Amino acid sequence: MRTATIKRKTKETDIEVTVNLDGAGVSNAATGIGFFDHMLDLLAKHSRIDITVKAVGDLHVDFHHTTEDVGIALGQAVRQALGNMAGIIRYASMLMPMDETLTRVVIDVSGRPFLVFKAEFPRDKIGEFDTELVREWFQAFAMNAGVTLHVETLYGENSHHIAESCFKGLARALRAAVAIDPQAAGEVPSTKGQLGG
């Protein structure tokens, strides 16, 4: 089973994340941030990755530290669960509609972290959640999962829909990229013979 648990504790947050890449999309997200929990639920459901997140953070300051640190821990858990990445599909893309919004997500599970994020939010907040934190989460996740990730909202008018299409798009792209390729016979999908450098 491709599973991992990451525990991360700082003066700002105390986080435990568990993932099962070969799960059923079961989510148990408890960050204290309702909208963020909703996004993590979507990520689990549409990636078919079981995700458990327990986070206690300095929410009295703002949601930044908790959101970013969950991205760090979740990225580390995915990377650890992937092991040497033998047999995975590696590349995937998804065009994700959400009503009037359309977002393109392209991923390379390469061990080389990079993020291109192009999404503009009409509003500064979704409820109490700062929309700028969507990019912060994707940055933290990509850097720590070791993935190259391109996220581009082609058009959209509703901030909630834009955020949701980004997370759902990542979910479906990630689901495809980490899937085991039955034709690869356990080979690492790289002419170098390894991923990560």
Curated annotation (Swiss-Prot):
Enzyme class of the recorded protein, top EC level: lyase
Record-level GO cellular component terms: cytoplasm
Catalytic reaction annotation: D-erythro-1-(imidazol-4-yl)glycerol 3-phosphate = 3-(imidazol-4-yl)-2-oxopropyl phosphate + H2O
Origin superkingdom: Bacteria
EC code: 4.2.1.19
Subcellular location per the Swiss-Prot or TrEMBL entry: Cytoplasm
InterPro entries xrefs: IGPD_sf, ImidazoleglycerolP_deHydtase, ImidazoleglycerP_deHydtase_CS, Ribosomal_Su5_D2-typ_SF
GO biological process, one term: L-histidine biosynthetic process
Pathway entry: Amino-acid biosynthesis; L-histidine biosynthesis; L-histidine from 5-phospho-alpha-D-ribose 1-diphosphate: step 6/9
UniProt keyword annotations, A-Z: Amino-acid biosynthesis, Cytoplasm, Histidine biosynthesis, Lyase
Membrane-spanning intervals of the chain: none
GO molecular function: imidazoleglycerol-phosphate dehydratase activity
Matching HAMAP family: HisB
UniProt family annotation: Belongs to the imidazoleglycerol-phosphate dehydratase family.
Protein's recorded name: Imidazoleglycerol-phosphate dehydratase
Record lineage: Bacteria, Pseudomonadati, Pseudomonadota, Alphaproteobacteria, Hyphomicrobiales
Name of the coding gene: hisB
